[in-house]
Amino acid sequence: MVAKGSDFETEIKEEIIVAEPRRFKVILLNDDYSTMDFVVEVLMVIFNKNFDEALGVMLKVHNEGRGVCGIYPYDVAETKVSQVKKKAEESGFPLRAILEEC
């Protein structure tokens, strides 16, 4: 931007700093009732994992009690958690997902 005066011109520079959005991990938690097939389906449908990726995350959830499904900005991560909850309730499973800030 240029400001004009009677005898001079002054250039004013504006610096805009854009911060990176905070990122959140969506984590599936193991339970004793959700089937392995259902967890793989959730990972493929909601998190767009291919079969091999979904199988790997499902096994991590099964063996370690939790597994990271993906890392997203807050609004996307929150939506994914809600989608997991809805699909689990509709299917009669107690599968849960949580958020953790990276």
From Swiss-Prot:
GO terms for biological process: protein catabolic process; proteolysis. Belongs to the ClpS family. Involved in the modulation of the specificity of the ClpAP-mediated ATP-dependent protein degradation. SUPFAM superfamilies: ClpS-like. Gene3D superfamilies: 3.30.1390.10. InterPro entries: ClpS (IPR022935), ClpS_core (IPR003769), Ribosomal_bL12_C/ClpS-like (IPR014719). This is ATP-dependent Clp protease adapter protein ClpS. Binds to the N-terminal domain of the chaperone ClpA.
